[in-house]
Amino acid sequence: MQFLIVTGMSGAGKSVALNFFEDMGFFCIDNLPPALISKFAELCLHSELDKIAVVSDIRGREFFNALFSELSSLEKRGIDYEILFLEASDEVLIRRYKETRRRHPLDEEGRVLDAIRKERHLLEEIKGKANKIIDTSKLSKQELNHELKKVYSSYFIGKQSMSVTIISFGYKYGIPMDADLVFDVRFLPNPYYVRSLKERTGEETVVQDYILKWPVTQKFYKRFFDMMDFLLPEYSREGKSHFTIAIGCTGGKHRSVTTAIKLKEFLLSKGYHVVVEHKDISK
């Protein structure tokens, strides 16, 4: 089990980090009271959860007394954990609070800088126990995601972090609105005009064999699959955790369906989690 505790300065990006880990398949909890950490970890041990990330920070008030005793309890129970600590400069934190117009959890007199300095002092000890410290002062949300992916790449070894949805559709019924990329395969040979194939669909081998036997299909599939093999890792590096590819033909029953199925087979061989939806196959 991978158990990650995310903590650090308020406004330093803990919510961004938690969203990243959730997109990467972690079970995530925000603002977990420190006193519940060891009990929660124990529950996770007896579940099917294998990757857990929790945010526990100064919002828990009785932060240090509870947190350090909970970490000690984890160690006694033999539960491995890591601590990620996020910080940023006073100037950046003040600017972020002004931009969001949110109140610092320790700000009782309207002095944000005093609250930030107090929090920094209180967090000094837990910072010293952190496995990884990231200063987000000069990082955008996207850049923080890049850094997290780099730092925690070992958590995803052997797995593609991006999931892919492939939608086949018919242009006569409209293009899916949620597609990231749309491909038009109406140039491929059309089984609709073959009497024995007209009422069949691209899910059937006989239709697939017809489409695949043509050189234009074979050339297109090679180039298409090579392009997706190049593009998806690049989109993943830009922070996308899910990608939707729409493939259209005239009616959405033959060419687009076959192409979606063959693309799925290719992406599965590359380790991606793939879901296929044939939007118009029954129309």
Curated annotation (Swiss-Prot):
InterPro entries: P-loop_NTPase (IPR027417), RapZ-like (IPR005337), RapZ-like_N (IPR053930), RapZ_C (IPR053931)
This protein's record includes keyword Nucleotide-binding: yes
UniProt: ATP binding residues: G8, M9, S10, G11, A12, G13, K14, S15
Binding site for GTP: D57, I58, R59, G60
Keywords: ATP-binding, GTP-binding, Nucleotide-binding
GO molecular function, a single term: GTP binding
Keyword Nucleotide-binding attributed: yes
Physiological role: Displays ATPase and GTPase activities.
Family: Belongs to the RapZ-like family.
UniProt name for this protein: Nucleotide-binding protein Hore_15880
Species the sequence originates in: Halothermothrix orenii (strain H 168 / OCM 544 / DSM 9562)
